[in-house]
Amino acid sequence: MTSGGSTRADVGIEGGRIVAIGDAGSASRDLDAAGLLVLPGCVDLHTHLASTPTFTPLDDFEHGTRAAIAGGVTTVCSMVYQEGTLRAGIERGLRDAERSLADFAFHVVVTDPTDAAVTELPSLARDGHTGLKVFMVTPRFGDRITDYVRLLRAAAAAGMLTAVHAEDHETVARATTLLHAAGHDAVRYFPESRPAAAEDIAIRAAAELAAKTGAAMYFVHLSSRVALAALAEAKSRGLHVYGETRPLYLYLTRERFERPDAALWVGQPPLREREDVEAIWNALRGGLLDTVGTDHYPHLRAAKLAPDLAFDRVPPGVANLETLLPMLYSEGVRRGRLTVERVVDVLATSPARIAGLRSKGEIAVGKDADIVIFDPEHTRTIRVGEMHSACDYDPFEGWEVTGWPMITLLRGEVVYADGEILAQPGQGRLVARDPSQGARS
């Protein structure tokens, strides 16, 4: 399967790359995929597997990529955080990723857009690093907008992608203050603290910055109808912008926040209305949205459900890597919302193209042999005890899914088969961005 169609053929692999598609002839080893789908390994451009000086994620590179390869995700892009210099953040990420079971790349979160940070970008681009990330939801972004404009111009000149967390700080801060003043501290008020208007305002402001600076922007975790409308307007202007949604917004609504365990679904932005869910499916089907990224960042159940936490103190994030592909196939293809080709596009081909990861995302001669042998008829119920994340709950616990990865190959090596992790920590490699591809492709 490719994003352009399907064919019945052998796939020949040698030296970790695809060398033939068709009649591959004799081989030293055969994998029988008769009756199954042969898909390219998924590329997730949005994970949080790297540590910071003060925090180590529950799913680090080892645990997170165990879940990834079990779910057919062979390349992960993790956020790393500036530590004085941007390169110091990348170096920490490289140390963390020494135990990765999947291939990996980084986005550097820029928290202090100094002149020195700006001057680092050309060398980072030459070294093949994919891009940056900025958080519009922090007060720092507005306070230092002149510095961020300079950063965006430099990123554009270097051909780097800028991932954007697009929620307007003032809108979120005002809503949060009003809720606390009214004594509405409970987690069920979380959706009201981050209204969809915050996305709308931020995306439109970011689009103006993209027009001003020439920056290529990748809007992460879009959750609402108004966010989609703002993205559509930016694209209609010919700006270099891309849109990502995440699994939570495809399957769940804010009704989860009426439950006693509402905190388990706290993520930023929050879950929205049923109309938003349907709009996101339409945007994914029609091509307005380019990718689905997990924003994988789980926390233990006890940490999420601590009784003394107000809505804005609950640690945000959930586990999604292992269920990314099977959920999208089951809820998308099986329900007639998406074609298999479109699933391949949004989970593999487009993410690789957008990030400039030339060797990834396609089953084609010359590409890395990152392959998922997928059984479209295999039905299973999601149970946390069967998942490979270190998290002790799953946001889709009890969900019946039809379609599941049976075998995952990373650069031609079988790293997962029939429920067993076969890869070793450290098997993953850094994937360099191709300077001729990526942000403006």
What are these regions (language model features)?
Residues 1-26:
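N-terminal metal-binding scaffold of metallo-dependent hydrolase/deaminase domains
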Residues 11, 16, 35, 46, ...:
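Divalent metal-coordination and catalytic microenvironments
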Residues 72-77, 101-105, 131, 209-217, ...:
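Short, surface-exposed connector motifs at secondary-structure boundaries
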Residues 306, 310, 365-431:
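C-terminal cap of metal-dependent C-N hydrolases
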